[in-house]
């Protein structure tokens, strides 16, 4: 900004932004452990038959992860940008549409590409009241392109400070949580009371920019998030939507589960909030996380195919724009990609060969790294035969070399849930064995199990 008198800069306005922080190279560690595919009685034969009767079966805990509910929020109008003032006391003329995310001419062709659009700066240095976060978004865009994600050309969306309340989500979230104090909702009664207290607290509200980085399973979302957090050099916090991933992120700085922040009894602040597996959270939880951290930028990482818009609690009703996406998986190969496409998922597999095989539900098969099931009742059946297994909802975001999926006829209804199908069919790198009866398998590979879920967008969450 130049003075209108002699070309010298006003003494109160800095000419340059602060220098970028040099990236720090770090490596994340990951590993898988296989569950023993053995019976606890060596005298028993491998050919077994689970107890029958649908009356003994429960639906399990799967439905708890189908986050979706609430009416579509009204259109969000951008706030007025803070205008930096000149040394003469006159306000600098405000640019038209200050909230727009524009193309960065300096970065075009070098890092983020010509289609990447980042916010214009409102003046001031990093940490000042006028700083909108150009450096952070510049760096995130650069890493996204380097990691194989493609820009959608959409800008980040600005949400006004009062959006949580004005959208109606705050009222519905409080009402829903209050009505379930004695029913769970992934929180104990004491935890629910703490969350309600945080919702009603008089915290300073902050407008924020939000965008989503989405990708199919195995596209590198987690690796990208690690790089952003470790090499960015800015004040950021990572939130894990899946708490079971905490051990895998133990070496990542400023990384917490969503519940740890939702129950936090002190005030914290960060510039950038990075949320992993955001489809496992509700819209109200995401907005409360932003409120607690007072963050200016919120970036969601996840797979939209693993979400749902069936109820208002779904993050989809926040209408966060997808700014980068990837449809190519480095995890599984062509056979799995073909199976997923028949299920309605727009997946592209890697170049390596993998396999999807079918085996009878009753009988024996080679051991794999992990056995997964849809319902708690099926897990208990297998455990009686000495076979350990894990719920599909608990392995979202995880990866294994080989996987066995058990599907008894009683669990057929779970296959109509697109979210659960997407997770179950995409955890392996080299081999997926599906244990079910032949008729069900043919319906599965032919994509004949269409979703039967009915919209309930008049409700915040499941009853």
From Swiss-Prot:
Coiled coil residues, start to end: none
Domain (+)RNA virus helicase C-terminal, residue spans: 327-463
Keyword tags: ATP-binding, Host cell junction, Host cytoplasm, Host cytoskeleton, Host nucleus, Hydrolase, Nucleotide-binding, Transport, Viral movement protein
Region (Nucleolar localization signal): 11-16, 37-52
Biased composition annotated in UniProt, kind: Polar residues: 23-49, 83-95
InterPro entries: (+)RNA_virus_helicase_core_dom, P-loop_NTPase
Single GO molecular function: hydrolase activity
Intracellular or extracellular location(s): Host cell junction, Host plasmodesma; Host nucleus; Host cytoplasm; Host nucleus, Host nucleolus
Entry keyword ATP-binding: yes
GO biological processes: transport of virus in host, cell to cell
Principal cellular location given in the protein's record: host cell
Entry EC number(s): 3.6.4.-
Cofactor(s) in the UniProt record: Mg(2+)
Chain ranges of the (+)RNA virus helicase ATP-binding domain: 185-326
GO cellular component, as recorded: host cell cytoplasm; host cell nucleolus; host cell plasmodesma; host cytoskeleton
UniProt-annotated stretches for the region Disordered: 1-126
Segments of skewed composition (Basic and acidic residues): 58-67, 96-107
Subunit and interaction comment: Homooligomer. TGB1-TGB3-TGB2 complex formation is enhanced by ATP hydrolysis. Interacts with the suppressor of RNA silencing (via N-terminus). Interacts (via N-terminus) with host importin IMPA1.
Comment block on domains: The N-terminal 84 amino acids contain a nucleolar localization signal.
Family: Belongs to the virgaviridae/benyvirus TGB1 movement protein family.
Name of the molecule in the record: Movement protein TGB1
Organism, as annotated: Potato mop-top virus (isolate Potato/Sweden/Sw) (PMTV)
